Each structure stands twice: as C-alpha cells, then as structure tokens.
Regions:
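Conserved beta-strand signature within the Rossmann-like core of class I S-adenosyl-L-methionine
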Residues: 147-149, 176-184
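Core SAM-dependent methyltransferase catalytic element
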Residues: 196-218
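Conserved S-adenosyl-L-methionine
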Residues: 57-59, 84
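Glycine-rich SAM-binding Motif I of class I
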Residues: 61-65, 87
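S-adenosyl-L-methionine
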Residues: 92-142
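A short glycine-rich, Lys/Arg-flanked "PGG" loop and its adjoining helix->strand segment in the class I
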Residues: 160-176
Length: 218
C-alpha cells in the first residue's frame, strides 16, 4: 500500500491511500466523524450492558479506540471483532495523534495495534479486541452481533463489499434489534439494505456530510 498521513479539519490525523485516492476518514474531521457516526448513532443506540460488535475495516483503529473509551466510561462489556484485509504498518499508526487529541494515554491504542491477529486480547476491563486479517467476502461469521460498524472504503472504490450477498450475510449474523451503521447514504446502498430486510433510517451526518445510514434488524 501507498499511504500518506494527513491532517483533518478537527486537528486529528487520517490516512490517505494514494493508490485508490481515498481517505480513511472525512477531511472535515476524523475524530468528529467517527464519534458522530459510530459512537453516537451506533454504540449509544444499543441499550445493552454486554455488546458484540463487528467492525468492517479496522483501518487506523480510531473506531475501536473511541468505542473502548465509551465502554469504559459507561461500564459496557464489548466483545469487539474487527476485519481488516490490509493492516497499516507500525510506522504509520505510531504517527497518529488520536490519543493526544482525545487527551488519553496511548498505551491502549498501541496495545490494539500490537495485538496478535486472530487472537482475542483484553484491552481494558470492559473491552476485548479480536482483529481478523481476512477479506470480508471470505470471512465465515460464527458470532451473533448486536452492532456492526460498516466502515469499508466507498462503493466507488470497493463495490464488491456493498452487495446484497454481503449485507445478507451480515443481516443473518445480527441479533434482533441489532444495528448496522455506516457513513454511506447512497440510494443504491439503502435500497440493497432494505431488500435484505433491514429497516432504514437516514440520519443527519457529521460536519461535511449531509446524511448517514442506520439499518436495524427487526
């Protein structure tokens, strides 16, 4: 991969994949975007004290870090599974300024990145992480989840991940009242989610984005 560390408008870093010309986060603000989409409209929408979470795209680890912070604060047990086909290098993740921006120590963030792929690792009292180095299409889901962070590259860049078959697989491995949350608000994506069986809500997006999509299994 050819990656470049960039600075977004809220002062936090993101990474740009220069080969496909796409950033891992909104340039309007990486932390603001992840907090708004995945924490406020994902994690906080699940009313449980023990949550199984699946993340599609570990990326920089920002969603995992924000989730761990929120779960520790609210005393929510989170079994967090994250799929990533192309992990970033230690050279890159050590440059990211999330912990400085969030005013937290970097030990847990580094522990997430340094944890062994394919092995569940306790990051804090309430947060266990399992990173899986595999393509989503090849991943055999064995867990029923309460929450899915769908944070893959956009449909224009990774169309193979935004299909009926992928969403159907995720739907079948989501508990009743479980939520799939994504930054993508494209009509074709919402129609596909609805066709699979999800109940769709278009929610206000973070700064720089008009809408996001929350899909619930009923």
């Amino acid at each position: 991969m050819s990656l470049e560390i960039i600075l977004t408008e809220d002062g936090s870093n993101s990474i740009k994949n220069t080969i496909i010309d796409e950033c891992y986060h909104s340039t309007s603000g990486a932390i603001d975007e992840s907090q708004h989409i995945f924490i406020q409209n994902g994690l906080q929408a699940i009313n449980k004290k023990t949550i199984n979470t699946l993340e599609i795209g570990f990326g920089t680890g920002l969603n995992a870090l924000l989730t761990q912070i929120e779960c520790d604060k609210k005393k929510i047990n989170n079994n967090y599974h994250s799929i990533e086909n192309l992990p970033i290098s230690s050279k890159d993740y050590k440059k990211l300024n999330y912990c400085k921006q969030l005013k937290v120590k970097d030990d847990r963030f580094l522990k997430m990145h340094n944890s062994t792929w394919g092995k569940e690792t306790p990051i804090s009292k309430y947060f266990n992480l399992l990173k899986i180095n595999i393509e989503l299409e090849k991943f055999n889901l064995k867990t029923q989840y309460d929450l899915i962070y769908f944070d893959a590259f956009s449909p224009n860049k990774q169309p193979e991940l935004w299909t009926y078959n992928i969403f159907k697989k995720l739907y079948e491995n989501l508990n009743t009242d479980g939520i799939l949350i994504t930054y993508c608000a494209k009509g074709i994506v919402k129609r596909t989610l609805k066709e699979v069986g999800f109940e769709i809500k278009s929610l206000a997006g973070p700064i720089g984005k008009r809408e996001i999509t929350q899909a619930k299994k009923k």
